């Protein structure tokens, strides 16, 4: 039986979970004002070349909401087209700070996936 085994980080200090990224937490992160979809719709710029070529679809962006609410590690989880993927990353990187997620009352890092829909209107 092994007891009292601590998780030690790279330099020998005990890992307090500060670098751990959670998928689900007691209090999930929230976007300021609550409506991230509305904010994205207002701030996304449809790439001209994609528009001219009728390219549309849903880009899934993964990122980490840090303990201070900032956004890091932004990457495309599932892309559509290079220009749409690039714009989706840009708009996520430009988001304001979120209210961070909490576990046991303390702010923690939380992984988040956000779908961004690029759809051309039929005008």
Predicted regions and their residues:
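Charge-biased low-complexity segments
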Residues: 1-123
